[in-house]
């Protein structure tokens, strides 16, 4: 079969080694004669899978002992509700930074539960889209927490700064598309959440990292499956969890450790992004409209100077084994999502194609 590189924004490419191992174990997991999908989530076999996955995840991010790790349903959008329902307490407002599509979606959901104070961080620098530095974010005095999205998959915008607002500010963040791609100081956050389908594993699983002093504050109307305390007290098994997604995510964690961990992956991700942005920046045929300081290393949107060639580009790239390059309907153009599982060979194949396409159509 010809080599295919999947640039989908999510569900996204999984490491080939992980897929191969899952395929080998699919019908007979560890000699049980059954699939891991078929065993009880409360049996000792799956409990071992769950415990190993959590420990490997903790190791990869150096998660402090006073933080709990929850394996949840609901995706990032579920946490758009889960965060206010768990953290508002007796307060009626929270600070929300608007820097892109997903941040705005979180704000829209939060309005059901509180009156968010919106910090519009979107700016333009030399004609390109950018984000205000954190020192310019005007936080309110009465906010229960601060929420932001470090990586906007649709806009291709990243906020790489580490928050430093003092211990009185509970920082929450949607790391769905950038978790495990670069070192992360978990201690600077109150809550970190991430849908699994981009940098962790298959869709259906959501990870939440929550500082333990923030437990026990859920609103009485909070659904039990979103209540961090309920989930923690039941080892993330208040109801049947997405066991296969949990198992596969655990395999990805072991794969990441074998690659050298998050620091090693960060170096590779930088190389991939530099390679792709380099081709875009050295061409009049392609363009990216995000300021360099806020460019995402995970999601690279780009446009053709002649958008009548978009359809041809997508058809020819697909035929060349470069799949899922169509940009989001909100922004159009192209988008290459180059998460951890995308090898540098895939990015090299894309850039070679882009150079050749420009030669033939420019």
UniProtKB/Swiss-Prot annotation:
Listed InterPro entries: Aminotrans_V_dom, Aminotrans_V_PyrdxlP_BS, Pser_aminoTfrase, PyrdxlP-dep_Trfase, PyrdxlP-dep_Trfase_major, PyrdxlP-dep_Trfase_small
Intrachain disulfide bonds: none
First-listed, main subcellular location of the protein, grouped into a coarse class: cytoplasm
Binding-site residues for pyridoxal 5'-phosphate, renumbered to this chain: 76-77, 102, 153, 174, 197, 239-240
UniProt record, GO biological process: L-serine biosynthetic process; pyridoxine biosynthetic process
GO molecular function: O-phospho-L-serine:2-oxoglutarate aminotransferase activity; pyridoxal phosphate binding
Subcellular location: Cytoplasm
Name the record gives this protein: Phosphoserine aminotransferase
């Amino acid at each position: 079969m010809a080599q295919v590189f999947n640039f989908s924004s999510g569900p996204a490419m999984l490491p080939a080694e992980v897929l191969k191992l899952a395929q080998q174990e699919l019908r007979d997991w560890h000699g049980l004669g059954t699939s891991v999908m078929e065993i009880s989530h409360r049996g000792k076999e799956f409990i071992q899978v769950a415990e190993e996955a959590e420990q490997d995840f903790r190791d990869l991010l150096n998660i402090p002992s006073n933080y709990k790790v929850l394996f949840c349903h609901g995706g990032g959008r579920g946490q758009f509700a889960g965060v206010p329902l768990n953290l508002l307490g007796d307060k009626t407002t929270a600070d929300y930074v608007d820097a892109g599509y997903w941040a705005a979606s979180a704000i829209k959901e939060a309005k059901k539960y509180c009156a968010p104070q919106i910090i519009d961080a979107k700016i333009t620098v030399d004609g390109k889209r950018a984000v205000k530095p954190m020192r310019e974010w005007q936080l309110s005095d009465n906010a229960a927490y601060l929420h932001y999205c470090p990586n906007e998959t649709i806009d291709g915008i990243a906020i790489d700064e580490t928050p430093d607002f003092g211990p009185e500010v509970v920082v929450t963040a949607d790391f769905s598309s950038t978790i495990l791609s670069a070192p992360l100081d978990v201690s600077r956050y109150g809550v970190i959440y991430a849908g699994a389908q981009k940098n962790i594993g298959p869709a259906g699983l959501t990870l939440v990292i929550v500082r333990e002093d923030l437990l026990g504050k859920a609103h009485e109307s909070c659904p039990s499956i979103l209540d961090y305390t309920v989930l923690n007290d039941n080892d993330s098994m208040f109801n049947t969890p997405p066991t296969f997604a949990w198992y596969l995510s655990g395999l990805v964690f072991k794969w990441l450790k074998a690659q050298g961990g998050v620091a090693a992956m960060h170096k590779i991700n930088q190389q991939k992004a530099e390679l792709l942005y380099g081709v875009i920046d050295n061409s009049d045929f392609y363009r990216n409209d995000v300021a360099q300081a806020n460019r995402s290393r995970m999601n690279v949107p780009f446009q053709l100077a002649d958008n009548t060639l978009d359809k041809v580009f997508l058809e020819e790239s697909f035929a060349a084994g470069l799949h899922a390059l169509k940009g989001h309907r909100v922004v159009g153009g192209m988008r290459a999502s180059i998460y951890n599982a995308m090898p540098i060979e895939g990015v090299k194949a894309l850039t070679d194609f882009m150079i050749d396409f420009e030669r033939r159509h420019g």
